[in-house]
């Protein structure tokens, strides 16, 4: 049963950002509290980003809702997320996409996220411990790719794993600020479809730890 607190959180999000009905339903279906570290449980239903281990953060639920909606979610099947973190974004995506693939480079976060997702019975979410810059070639091509960390550029490996005509949404570092951009793949190259808004994400880092 979905909690009143989670419902009220979604109401607050909707006041700030008009939610697609599918995104709102997905956000209401996933209890954020499950993904929040114990010391911050009392902040679970605020719109704040919250600290996790390994100098990482669970994104604001407002940000999660926006990033999900920016993917243009109608008539799509698969999505690859770069940066699983707590697993919250992947869980929300699982309510919309038939298949969700998420890569995490920090082993402790990967193990915790995998356990949470399994406990929730989200069998359509697949999580891998690996360098996100390399994507997950085994199940490519993907209809959508979502970066949950800020990139300086999009690696060719990920462009190759995106379906022709597919959409990639990523925070991009530009000079001294980050901006969320939506790209579309055309003729095997990415074209900026829209610059969406300024943002603040942890950076994409090479390798694993």
From Swiss-Prot:
This enzyme's EC code(s): 2.1.1.77
Family annotation (Pfam families): PCMT (PF01135)
GO CC annotation: cytoplasm
Keyword S-adenosyl-L-methionine among record annotations: yes
Active-site residues, Swiss-Prot/TrEMBL: 59
Signal peptide (from-to): none
GO molecular function terms listed in the Swiss-Prot or TrEMBL record: protein-L-isoaspartate (D-aspartate) O-methyltransferase activity
Keyword terms, alphabetized: Cytoplasm, Methyltransferase, S-adenosyl-L-methionine, Transferase
PROSITE patterns cross-referenced by the UniProt entry: PCMT
InterPro entries in alphabetical order: PCMT, SAM-dependent_MTases_sf
Family: Belongs to the methyltransferase superfamily. L-isoaspartyl/D-aspartyl protein methyltransferase family.
Protein name: Protein-L-isoaspartate O-methyltransferase
